């Protein structure tokens, strides 16, 4: 519910001295809170609804079109999305947009831009607030089921992603956008100054990943909320859930041409949008090579753009847990198991390297191996006791298997547990822990994006040197955690690891950021660190205009010193 702040509106009116036209832009206070994460216990209404939705998807293939304007477009370039844990089940049949259709989508978006941008932010926000309500209520089970079946997520991983986080993105972004309207420059009589937060001039290309349904909704949704028009290229391996999110936005009142839903071949999409003079932004989550390629394409075409495109990218990480000898072992073990192996290590923030002190390693190792035996890997749609499921596709499976082959063949690496792979039914990889004698081995440096945890054991007295090693080993800077009870060590670690992580955790796991609480993102090779989930992110998708109005004659053109 939008609560109008009459007092603040009156204050703004008095300060600016021009009542006409300002009420439309008066600041609103939107009260929001994080969406509760449902438990899905036996016999609960949410569990019953989810099981019903999963049953409806069993053996079903949904046909998904490109949507340009208000028209569903079916092309001859047909693709399929397979369920990761049962690749014989094609969950979606969709078609790729070619260059001609993408150009048509650009034209349709541009035609709608001016009217959408001129709408008051409160009106645009209502669309996303309604979408959040639909996700929170009648459409929750559908989106969760499609995320589980299509992307291989367990109940809880789907819930914290496709429900809680996406709902939070829509609600908090609406709050941040409306509060931004209240950020106005100082006015000094006889003039009043105001700031208009316009959308960008052109279209934004949103390119989303497979691993979070919420990220796709936010990459397209946040720029649209701020008055922009968007071409959304969803991931081939998240098509089912992405299309559901798009339909919910339309059901919530999003006009037809604001977000164009255009599945496409990656290079075709990239070439087309970066060659358009109207490109004004790219909102991206994916691999470093892809983002670098898009950046280079923008640079090569710089002279043709009407405006400098905004480039926002999140590109993953090689995230760490550093353990000091003063750490609580229970916290280390529980936090590391969750961070490294939830969703099969396919989170951008997943812990992929652990630095353990020699004095604690026997205890930590014993506990990790003991608990690892209780992790169930399987079909999350049929067994709610599954901790994680298959990795996303054959390409990912093959890449992870090569890392495991490296672990078996390298003299500096020892597989302590797990590592078996089986792709006969789904793309299953056992959780694997690898100990290394070489802290510079590639397994400690490069992103794996799978259920593989690399461990380096360091001498206790060399913890400062090891902290420097943590900072310098990889090119990434996304997330990391330090486990210690010694306050001096925590202070030293915070200073030495200042640029090693954009999201830094103390005595907590490296995953699990919450919208509004821990805005997410990192620098270095991890991206542009624009912090979606925080108040500054929406500003990224605006082009502010300052208006000065002087109330009275300007007087003599001559300066006093000239007399």
Swiss-Prot record:
- Primary localization class, coarse: mitochondrion
- UniProt GO cellular component terms: mitochondrial matrix
- EC numbers listed for it are 1.2.1.88
Gene3D superfamilies to which the protein is assigned, alphabetical: Aldehyde Dehydrogenase, Chain A, domain 1, Aldehyde Dehydrogenase, Chain A, domain 2
Q: What class of enzyme is it?
A: oxidoreductase
* Cellular localization per UniProt: Mitochondrion matrix
Instruction: Enumerate the InterPro entries for this protein.
Output: Ald_DH/histidinol_DH, Ald_DH_C, Ald_DH_CS_CYS, Ald_DH_CS_GLU, Ald_DH_N, Aldehyde_DH_dom, P5CDH/ALDH4A1
Instruction: Name the catalysed reactions.
Output: L-glutamate 5-semialdehyde + NAD(+) + H2O = L-glutamate + NADH + 2 H(+)
> Which annotated residues bind substrate?
513
Q: Which residues bind NAD(+)?
A: 208, 233, 286-290, 447
Check the record and name the SUPFAM superfamilies matching this protein: ALDH-like
Which pathway does this chain act in?
Amino-acid degradation; L-proline degradation into L-glutamate; L-glutamate from L-proline: step 2/2
GO biological process entries: proline catabolic process to glutamate
User: What GO MF annotations does this protein's record show?
Assistant: 1-pyrroline-5-carboxylate dehydrogenase activity
Q: Which residues carry this modification: N6-acetyllysine?
A: 52, 93, 99, 114, 130, 175, 318, 365, 376, 509, 531
Q: Does the keyword Cytoplasm apply?
A: no
Q: Any idea which residues bear Phosphoserine here?
A: 44
Statement: the UniProt record of this protein carries the keyword Oxidoreductase: yes
Q: Which UniProt keywords apply?
A: Acetylation, Mitochondrion, NAD, Oxidoreductase, Phosphoprotein, Proline metabolism, Transit peptide
Subunit structure, per the record?
Homodimer.
Family of the protein in this entry: Belongs to the aldehyde dehydrogenase family.
Summary of the function given for this chain in its UniProt record: Irreversible conversion of delta-1-pyrroline-5-carboxylate (P5C), derived either from proline or ornithine, to glutamate. This is a necessary step in the pathway interconnecting the urea and tricarboxylic acid cycles. The preferred substrate is glutamic gamma-semialdehyde, other substrates include succinic, glutaric and adipic semialdehydes.
The molecule here is called: Delta-1-pyrroline-5-carboxylate dehydrogenase, mitochondrial
